[in-house]
Amino acid sequence: MINWNNVMTTLKGGRVVTVDPASWNMNNPEYAEILKLWKDGNFNTDSVKWTNYYTTQEIETVIAGELNITPLRSWISCIEPGYMTGYHYDIDDNEEEYLKHGLLKRYSVFISNPSVGHLFILGKEYFYNNPQGTIIKWSNYREWHNGINGGLENKYMFHIIGY
């Protein structure tokens, strides 16, 4: 059993993600596509900010065992109050390498306690007030999604991709 509260309080060395093309791999046309969609939709890009933590190897091993998958990548995302991720699909420069393993599977775990204002949209499904530890399986690892924090506490999720 993972103590998610302990995990959240001990996270270090996160990578902040904002709408700053200088920090994106703009050689990958998919980044430009998402940025164009946001600009064309008059999206408030100042509201886009989250932090990814990649020091998740121990958790990855436990969760991958529970899900019976071989992990390729995992991370914890944190959205601070008042921010969101923007509607997007995840772009990974290592995707070609991952696909050599066959069909990819993706799962997300709600690791925060339920809190007013926390919302996760996956395709056409909306998730809110999910109990801590709830696991959802994605139908497509590249599904469009959006995390939103309209609450007063940080919103954390654990994500894992494997085969």
Locations of regions flagged by a protein language model:
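Catalytic core of Fe(II)/2-oxoglutarate
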Residues: N113-Y163
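Short, conserved beta-strand element in jelly-roll/cupin
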Residues: C78-E80, E97-V116, I161
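Non-heme Fe(II)/2-oxoglutarate
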Residues: M1-W75
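Tight coil/turn sites that cap or link beta-strands
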Residues: E80-Y83, G133
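A general structural signal for short secondary-structure junctions and capping/turn motifs
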Residues: G65-N68, Y98-H101, F127-N129, I148-G151
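Short catalytic/ligand-binding loop motif for oxyanion handling, primarily in non-cytosolic enzymes
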Residues: Y83-Y87, N94-E95, H118, W144-I148
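A short beta-loop-beta micro-motif enriched in histidine and acidic residues
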Residues: T70-L72, G86-Y107
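Short, surface-exposed charged micro-motifs
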Residues: W75, S108, N146
